[in-house]
């Protein structure tokens, strides 16, 4: 396909965020040619390429900047999706360089024939997928169901076993002692449960391995590599119980000396009369005739016994003080050679003495000016002892005197000074006769242990300090610039105090809900004037209130310069000058005035057809509006089904917060919540200050569930909060869809209720009630499970997939289930918008209250930076001081946001966007040519998140317990170069568990899902940074830290106890602990707006054994528990998981058609009904014409938006 870039195309503001949207040449981001990459199911762009290839006959796909086109591939796979029925083509590497033109703002490709242009077969323009052609031979049959080259009853082709073979063998090997019968006896009847238990034991063993390694590294490594069993004693500190001989200390306290001259038999030489204790006796056991042989020679008149060059001794055999203060004395006490121990018996007795320690000198000792000491090869030599040599009897080399007399050598290491062989032999000789000890040095092992210790210390401190610094930077600099408004320091601190006041007391200036103009209120009805006139199309619609915008179309670049950022609405405005709506013979046809095909159809009107694209005071813009005969081609949904009281759409240039508004779906998933919890959530979303024209509430009830303590089922509670339903409540039908489950539960049914949110005047005053469109989807289950305890229940992930799969079908114009078509039609009924208009999804749990301006700041961040694919706000605790269980959670919540998420947000890689309050981008603008990149609606996200094959412990923990965190991880894996950030300006509050058993159950799910998601993320190689300075390495450290939490807190307590009861005090360990636990406390003092958090910090410290030992240990032992436990309880329900397989999936019950086929079928049915009715009424001629728009702007009096001043004078009904 051709590239739609044009040299004259305007460059809008969002391009600055996307450096790849320029015209520069060169390969981007990767040294590997993506077109040569391996294309299999493990590739992050695999499913996207499948869909792009399958739907390439009616959508345009922009190749990446590397030239890769997913539609042109030689490698195709036979694998198929479990939610769709497309074939498997290849994919391309860089998703940022590819896109789908949800709006082509330039001319059609020159390579596309004119016929294709007329039918829009070759491309996809504006917001729709216009693949309808006159020849229906290639269209799917009306009753076509899911088809495939293989039976759909098979859940999914089995994966090769070789990748998990080793793990299975290991699990069976380590649990060999627990045979299957024994496990069955202990309540594990099925093979799946038994193998899950074996996997649990295998994972626990791995955790023990990691903990043992950390323990060894902390306590055992030094002892292993630096295991010096000999005690080392510093010189001048050798006490009287030891005798020093040749630099070694001997314990002679229990020795007995044989009878000798002056010595009685059995006496101890350490005591009187010898008094040798603590002295140096090296001259009493001289090393002679070794290295000194040939150097120290006898004189001719030598009185020392000798044999050739061998001498009996060199110095007089006397004791001298260890401090070297003894002067030379060449006399003998009793006779010549007395005490020299030259006999074989004396020598053997000496050699058998046990060495109790080495005597060592520090460098300060060596440099002692009172002694003449030098170091040679680690040995300390006392050169003054040369003076003891009996020079009258022997001769020695002149080098001895030179070394002794040269002051420059004193206190130095002379190992490198003595270089030639003669000098080295002389040095070895001196080592044998005048060595007094060893220099204070460590062995290689000891040095290595210290290096490891200090490197670990530096690394841990670096991580902690860098996180602290980054968190402070984020708080003081980055966060103030986020969102719709930039605050200075004082205003930012004031806002934080307002949020805290709102959390604690549910009031505050910033939390006040604004008054709503009368005509925008929930109780205002169009029927108050003339409801039927809304549908009357007797007169042509004109430019009306937006006439001032016509100036932009005289200057092609004027409008594009108006919009700094890109949204679907701004691109709709740009259509006016690019001739959208040229179809067949109507392309150059003037309906209300003459204009050619290049002119906008801004003024184009038609009976039951398009109106002014910008002049839409009612939000009834249908990008598929018919411009031909509907009996031949279905180009759009019928405008006659639009609700008369839809919320008006403001002009496209309306920017109340300084950025173009983006349409947002507010998804609220419900399970067993009570009325109060659901009402609080829906009230807070409905009353946010974000314009109600751009927000839609979508509530999905996960089954017919009655929460514990509730009088009604959850669906009934929600439906009681709706009014003005498009279809009466008791007439709504159930529609089929493919659920995220296995076996017969893959077929599920749901009902779609469309209307508007119904406030309670006691919770929200009438003057503050915005009119909000609302859709409720109730998963009611198939008729076969009507009597089951929880009919329709498939889990929260299935609820999310209902929306995500629907958005994918809309973006790619794929075949839809009947439920998805009903969703498309319901959105059209209550908003007048096609679903493609929506760009953002806010996900909120049904027990969360949102701060009034949170949605505004979150959408602002999305619109201003198209590279952001997901973000989250701050979750506050509303019941802080309810019990000790809630109190210990306050600081944990705070630090997880303002340290962990703040640090990750600096690098755009927040690893967990909490499902209770987060926002995802459905699609992102790409370049200036109208292309959009599917994000949340990306097939790779939808297919992998909807995976129903959960046959391993790892996948069950990912998909059944931690689906919210898994979605965040999946987004980072699929789009590693895009951002997930934290926006503290957006705040919400929720009620946390107040009972320990509930907290235990909740954290069991969170911890286990965290471990498995971190393991997934640590394998992502494309995250920012390199080696140790990368998010991947930080995630690896976080994974190890999570696994060893129980061991770490045990080591911490041990170190503290050792520091108290023993010596020496482990100073470094205590400093490390102080930094690790102290910096978070400093973070509170520096950044928090309420000092009460310091109290909760102290409480958190006392609760550390619970957080770091009790909770993770319990979670690890419950690795094979996939239930939600005590977190969500239902009346009469169980706590089972959604992984059970029951029955077989019958695909024939689920029809899959494109939305046009569904619409054609609906219109045909209605036409038949009308014909039958006309026959019954004798063809009455007073029927109303089919309406084409939901609102006549001539009724507004020229005003699109009511002024607040009207609120005082206008009434409401």
Curated annotation (Swiss-Prot):
Principal location class: membrane
Positions of glycan attachment: 588, 1008
Listed name of the protein: Chitin synthase 3
EC number(s) from the headed UniProt entry: 2.4.1.16
Function noted in UniProt: Polymerizes chitin, a structural polymer of the cell wall and septum, by transferring the sugar moiety of UDP-GlcNAc to the non-reducing end of the growing chitin polymer.
UniProt subcellular location: Cell membrane
GO biological process: ascospore wall assembly; cellular response to mechanical stimulus; chitin biosynthetic process; hyphal growth; protein localization to bud neck
Catalytic activities: [(1->4)-N-acetyl-beta-D-glucosaminyl](n) + UDP-N-acetyl-alpha-D-glucosamine = [(1->4)-N-acetyl-beta-D-glucosaminyl](n+1) + UDP + H(+)
Family membership: Belongs to the chitin synthase family. Class IV subfamily.
GO CC entries: cell septum; cellular bud neck; chitosome; extracellular vesicle; incipient cellular bud site; plasma membrane; prospore membrane
Species the sequence originates in: Candida albicans (Yeast)
Alphabetical list of InterPro entries matching this protein: Chitin_synth, CHS4-like_dom, Nucleotide-diphossugar_trans
Record topology, Extracellular segments: 190-200, 472-1016, 1061-1065
Gene name of the record: CHS3
Membrane topology: Multi-pass membrane protein
Keyword Glycosyltransferase set for record: yes
Comp. bias regions, Basic and acidic residues: 32-44
Broad class of enzyme this protein falls into: transferase
The organism's taxonomic lineage, starting at the top: Eukaryota, Fungi, Dikarya, Ascomycota, Saccharomycotina
């Amino acid at each position: 396909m051709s590239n739609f870039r044009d040299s004259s195309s305007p460059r809008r503001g969002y391009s600055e965020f996307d450096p790849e949207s320029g015209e520069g040449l060169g390969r981007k981001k990767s040294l590997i040619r993506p077109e040569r990459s391996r294309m299999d199911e493990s590739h992050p762009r695999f499913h996207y390429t499948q869909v792009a290839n399958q739907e390439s006959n009616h959508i345009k796909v922009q190749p990446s900047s590397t030239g890769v086109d997913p539609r042109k591939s030689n490698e195709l796979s036979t694998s198929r999706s479990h939610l769709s029925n497309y074939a498997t083509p290849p994919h391309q590497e860089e998703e940022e360089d590819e896109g789908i033109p949800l709006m082509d703002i330039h001319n059609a490709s020159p390579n596309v024939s004119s016929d294709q242009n007329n039918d829009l077969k070759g491309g996809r323009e504006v917001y729709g997928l216009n693949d309808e052609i006159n020849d229906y031979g290639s269209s799917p049959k009306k009753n076509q169901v899911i088809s495939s080259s293989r039976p759909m009853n098979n859940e999914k082709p089995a994966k090769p076993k070789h990748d998990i073979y080793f793990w299975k063998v290991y699990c069976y090997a380590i649990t060999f002692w627990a045979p299957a019968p024994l496990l069955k006896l202990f309540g594990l009847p099925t093979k799946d449960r038994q193998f899950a238990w074996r996997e649990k034991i295998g994972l626990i063993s791995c955790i023990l391995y990691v903990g043992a390694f950390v323990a060894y590294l902390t306590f055992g490594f030094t002892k292993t590599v630096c295991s010096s069993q000999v005690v080392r004693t510093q010189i001048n500190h050798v006490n009287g119980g030891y005798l020093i001989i040749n630099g070694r200390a001997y314990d002679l306290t229990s020795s007995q000396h044989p009878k000798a001259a002056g010595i009685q038999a059995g006496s101890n030489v350490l005591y009187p009369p010898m008094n040798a204790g603590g002295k140096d006796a090296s001259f009493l056991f001289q090393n002679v005739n070794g290295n000194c042989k040939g150097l120290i020679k006898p004189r001719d008149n030598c009185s020392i016994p000798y044999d050739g060059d061998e001498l009996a001794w060199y110095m007089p055999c006397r004791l001298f003080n260890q401090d070297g203060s003894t002067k030379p004395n060449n006399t003998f006490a009793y006779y010549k050679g007395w005490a020299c121990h030259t006999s074989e018996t004396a020598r053997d007795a000496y050699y058998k003495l046990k060495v109790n320690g080495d005597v060592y000198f520090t460098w300060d000792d060596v440099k002692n000016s009172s002694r003449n000491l030098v170091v040679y090869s680690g040995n300390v030599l006392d050169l003054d002892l040369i003076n003891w040599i009996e020079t009258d009897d022997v001769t020695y080399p002149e080098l001895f005197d030179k070394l002794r007399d040269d002051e420059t050598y004193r206190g130095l290491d002379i190992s490198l000074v003595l270089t030639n062989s003669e000098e080295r032999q002389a040095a070895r000789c001196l080592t044998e006769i005048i060595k007094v000890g060893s220099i204070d040095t460590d062995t290689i092992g000891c040095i290595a242990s210290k290096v490891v210790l200090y490197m670990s210390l530096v690394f841990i401190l670096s991580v902690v300090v860098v996180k602290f610094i980054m968190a402070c930077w984020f708080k003081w600099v980055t966060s103030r610039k986020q969102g719709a408004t930039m605050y200075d320091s004082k205003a930012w601190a004031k806002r934080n105090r307002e949020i805290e006041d709102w959390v604690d007391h549910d009031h505050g200036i910033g939390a006040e809900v604004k008054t709503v103009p009368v005509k925008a209120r929930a109780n205002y009805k169009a029927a108050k004037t003339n409801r039927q006139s809304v549908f009357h199309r007797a007169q042509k619609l004109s430019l009306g209130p937006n006439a001032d915008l016509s100036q932009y179309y005289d200057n092609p670049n004027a409008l594009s310069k108006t919009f700094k950022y890109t949204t679907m609405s701004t691109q709709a405005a740009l259509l006016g000058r690019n001739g959208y709506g040229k179809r067949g013979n109507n392309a150059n046809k003037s309906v209300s005035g003459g204009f050619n095909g290049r002119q906008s159809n801004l003024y184009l009107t038609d009976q039951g057809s398009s109106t002014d694209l910008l002049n839409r005071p009612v939000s009834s813009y249908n990008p598929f509006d018919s411009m031909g005969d509907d009996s031949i081609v279905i180009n759009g949904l019928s405008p006659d089904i639009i609700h008369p009281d839809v919320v008006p759409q403001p002009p496209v240039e309306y920017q109340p917060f300084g950025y173009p508004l983006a349409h947002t779906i507010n998804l609220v998933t419900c399970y067993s919540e009570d009325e109060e919890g659901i009402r609080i959530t829906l009230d807070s979303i409905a009353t946010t200050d974000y314009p109600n024209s751009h927000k839609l509430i979508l509530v999905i009830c996960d089954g017919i569930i009655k929460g514990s303590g509730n009088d009604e089922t959850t669906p009934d509670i929600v439906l009681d909060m709706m009014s003005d339903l498009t279809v009466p409540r008791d007439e709504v039908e159930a529609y089929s869809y493919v659920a995220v489950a296995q076996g017969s539960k893959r077929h599920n049914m749901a009902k779609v209720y469309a209307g508007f949110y119904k406030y309670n005047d006691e919770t929200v005053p009438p003057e503050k009630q915005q009119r909000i469109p609302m859709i409720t989807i109730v998963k009611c289950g198939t008729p076969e499970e009507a009597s089951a305890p929880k009919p329709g229940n498939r889990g929260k992930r299935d609820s999310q997939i209902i929306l995500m799969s629907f958005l994918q079908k809309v973006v790619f114009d794929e075949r839809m289930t009947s439920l998805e078509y009903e969703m498309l039609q319901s959105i059209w009924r209550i908003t007048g918008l096609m679903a493609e208009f929506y760009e953002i999804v806010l996900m909120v749990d049904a027990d969360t209250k949102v701060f009034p301006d949170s949605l505004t700041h979150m959408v602002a961040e999305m619109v201003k930076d198209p590279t952001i694919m997901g973000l989250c706000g701050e979750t506050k605790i509303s019941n802080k001081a309810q019990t000790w269980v809630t109190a210990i959670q306050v600081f944990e919540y705070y630090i997880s946001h303002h340290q962990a998420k703040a640090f990750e947000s600096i690098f755009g890689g927040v690893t967990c966007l909490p499902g209770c309050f987060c926002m995802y981008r459905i699609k992102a603008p790409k370049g200036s040519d109208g292309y959009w990149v599917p994000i949340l609606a990306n097939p790779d996200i939808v297919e992998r998140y909807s995976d129903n094959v959960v046959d391993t412990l790892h996948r069950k923990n990912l998909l059944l317990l931690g689906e919210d965190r898994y979605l965040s991880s999946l987004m980072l894996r699929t789009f590693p170069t895009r951002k997930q950030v934290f926006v503290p300006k957006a705040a919400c509050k929720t009620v946390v568990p107040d009972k320990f058993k509930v907290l235990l159950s909740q954290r069991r799910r969170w911890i286990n899902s965290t471990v498995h998601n971190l393991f997934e993320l640590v394998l992502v190689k494309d995250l920012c940074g390199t080696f140790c300075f990368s998010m991947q390495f930080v995630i690896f450290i976080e994974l190890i830290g999570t696994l060893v939490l129980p061991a770490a807190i045990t080591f911490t307590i041990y170190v503290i106890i050792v520091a108290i009861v023993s010596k020496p005090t482990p100073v470094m360990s205590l400093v490390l602990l102080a930094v690790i636990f102290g910096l978070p406390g400093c973070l509170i003092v520096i950044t928090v707006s309420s000092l009460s958090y310091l109290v909760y910090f102290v409480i958190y410290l006392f609760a550390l054994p619970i957080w770091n030992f009790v909770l993770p240990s319990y979670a690890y032992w419950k690795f094979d528990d996939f239930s939600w436990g005590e977190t969500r309880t239902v009346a009469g329900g169980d706590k089972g998981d959604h992984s059970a397989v029951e029955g077989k999936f019958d695909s024939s019950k689920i029809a899959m058609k494109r939305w046009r086929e569904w619409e054609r079928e609906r219109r045909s049915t209605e036409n038949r009904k009308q014909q039958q009715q006309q026959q019954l009424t004798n063809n009455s001629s007073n029927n109303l014409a089919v309406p084409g728009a939901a609102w006549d702007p001539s009724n507004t009096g020229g005003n699109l938006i009511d002024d607040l001043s009207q609120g005082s004078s206008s009434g409401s009904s």
